[in-house]
Amino acid sequence: MSRLNINTKLVRRMLVGFLQDEIWKVGAKKAVLGLSGGIDSALVCHLAAEALGPENVHAICMPYRTSNPESEAHARLVAEASGVQFSVVGITPMVDAYFDQFPDANNMRRGNKMARERMTVLFDHSALYGGLVLGTSNKTELLLGYGTLYGDMASALNPIGDLYKTQVWQLSEEVGVPKPVIEKKPSADLWAGQTDEEELGFTYREVDELLYRMVDQRADTAELVAAGFKQEFVSSIYSKVQNSHFKRRLPVIAKVSGRTIDRDFRYSRDWGK
């Protein structure tokens, strides 16, 4: 049995309860999420529908003109399967208006801009519906820094941030995510033909095995190499995790007082509750 195997029924109950507790305790009843047509957002959509009722979940597909038409088709498929409220908001006019001033911008800049435009749409709809924005980044992406700061990494709550990609696949089977979404190659769909694993240079299953030992089991480099991982791979992943730490925390605040936010003023739960 793989170390990454999870009790999907138990984790399902935990995450449904998490969404209910965190959303209801602030007086909200609804949730908003971006539905890309990929497996991560599909899983969050199904969990939110189960936790809040599909009528209280607003899923928004936000295509750009180069987006694969299959992505929107799969987003619709997930919305139909989960029964949530679904809408499409194109981001082409907003993105192109900006890059008309910077026509030589590379794919990375354009992809980050798209992610941040989608973030603004989601938080605007959060205000419209009075719901919290749900994050859809998994643990693998968060550890590698494979996401856009204040873009797809921005949310009020993230129910799948402690699930490796391998575990996202497992739980998606449990909750009933449509097969075409589970079986397709992971892609952020930021430019034509882009796939996550080709861009990263390794498969999610390979890196998940390494990350689990490195992070969850705290294995050092010598132990990881002894377990069969190549030294170059271990060093590369360690660097990615280390260099992307700024994406996983609040902005660093210069300390000038007796109690500084995220330094001395830190609480595991809401202050005073």
From Swiss-Prot:
Pathway: Cofactor biosynthesis; NAD(+) biosynthesis; NAD(+) from deamido-NAD(+) (ammonia route): step 1/1. It is an enzyme of class 6 (ligase). Mg(2+) binds at residues 40, 141. ATP binds at residues 34-41, 136, 165, 187. One of its GO terms (cellular component) is cytoplasm. It catalyses: deamido-NAD(+) + NH4(+) + ATP = AMP + diphosphate + NAD(+) + H(+). InterPro entries: NAD/GMP_synthase, NAD_synthase, NH(3)-dep_NAD(+)_synth, Rossmann-like_a/b/a_fold. GO terms for molecular function: ATP binding; glutaminase activity; metal ion binding; NAD+ synthase (glutamine-hydrolyzing) activity; NAD+ synthase activity. Its EC number is 6.3.1.5. Gene3D superfamilies: HUPs (3.40.50.620). One of its GO terms (biological process) is NAD biosynthetic process. It holds the Pfam family NAD_synthase. CDD domains: NAD_synthase (cd00553). The keyword Aminoacyl-tRNA synthetase does not apply. Deamido-NAD(+) binds at residue 116. The keyword Magnesium applies. Keywords: ATP-binding, Ligase, Magnesium, Metal-binding, NAD, Nucleotide-binding. Disulfide bonds: none annotated. Homodimer. NCBIfam families: nadE, PRK13980.1. Catalyzes the ATP-dependent amidation of deamido-NAD to form NAD. Uses ammonia as a nitrogen source. Belongs to the NAD synthetase family. This is NH(3)-dependent NAD(+) synthetase. The lineage of its organism: Bacteria, Pseudomonadati, Thermodesulfobacteriota, Desulfuromonadia, Geobacterales.
